[in-house]
């Protein structure tokens, strides 16, 4: 199996096609799970990020091989890693107020960043690491999500955010909550 990968390490049309195909598959594996759970960055986004990162590493190899033997092959990859942070930041949403804040989208942002890193591995020709990373990343995102939903997200505490603009006194809402045996611990 490793001999197969060795034959694809150079810059040939076959190796370029294989790298983009592998980047598509790795990005799709992670993106599928995100799409299935209705997250902002899903299948297409993860594939595009992974292919884009792979293309940057291919460009690095090409520039190093054909134009400048003293070029820094990590420079463009470093820009991908820092630049993807801006895309990931756009998926993070903070809801609520100071005490009841919820942050959503961190796993999506981290998944995009990791997909970019996975694409850099693919683009550099480090196939074994990219396949192993894809398996671990999928396991963490998909399988641990089930553990999270089953064991960590179940709680007897419910946070409710209500914006009240009606003319009736707020005590009407509090009375209704108490009749349902809800305990209000904090109000602003």
Predicted regions located by residue number:
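Alpha-helical transmembrane segments and their membrane-interface boundaries
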Residues: 1-72, 76
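Lipid-exposed faces of alpha-helical membrane segments in multi-pass integral membrane proteins
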Residues: 18-25, 52, 81, 132, ...
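C-terminal ends of transmembrane helices
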Residues: 27-39, 87-100, 146
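Small-residue-rich segments of transmembrane alpha-helices in multi-pass membrane proteins
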Residues: 48-58, 82, 107-121, 164-167
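Juxtamembrane membrane-interface segments at transmembrane alpha-helix termini
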Residues: 57-64, 117-123, 142-151
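Ligand-binding beta-strand-loop-alpha-helix segment within the catalytic cores
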Residues: 61, 77-89
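Structural signal for the N-terminal portions of transmembrane helices
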Residues: 70-76, 95, 101-142
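Canonical alpha-helical transmembrane segment with a positive-inside/aromatic-interface signature
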Residues: 100-101, 126-188
């Amino acid at each position: 199996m490793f001999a197969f990968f060795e034959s694809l390490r150079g810059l040939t049309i076959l190796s370029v096609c294989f790298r983009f195909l592998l980047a598509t598959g790795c990005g799709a594996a992670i993106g599928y799970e995100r799409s299935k759970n209705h997250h902002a960055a899903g299948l297409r986004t993860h594939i595009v990020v992974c292919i884009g990162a792979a293309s940057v590493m291919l460009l690095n190899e090409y520039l190093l091989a054909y134009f400048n033997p003293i070029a820094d092959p990590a420079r463009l990859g470093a820009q991908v890693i820092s630049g993807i942070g801006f895309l990931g930041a756009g998926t993070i949403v903070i809801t609520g107020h100071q005490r009841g804040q919820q942050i959503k989208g961190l796993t999506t942002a981290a998944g995009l960043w990791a997909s970019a890193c996975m694409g850099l591995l693919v683009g550099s020709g480090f196939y074994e690491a990219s396949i192993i990373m894809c398996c671990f990343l999928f396991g963490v995102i998909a399988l641990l999500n089930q553990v999270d939903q089953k064991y960590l997200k179940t709680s007897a505490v419910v946070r409710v955010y209500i914006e009240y603009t009606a003319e009736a006194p707020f005590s009407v809402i509090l009375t209704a909550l108490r009749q349902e045996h809800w305990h209000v611990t904090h109000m602003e």
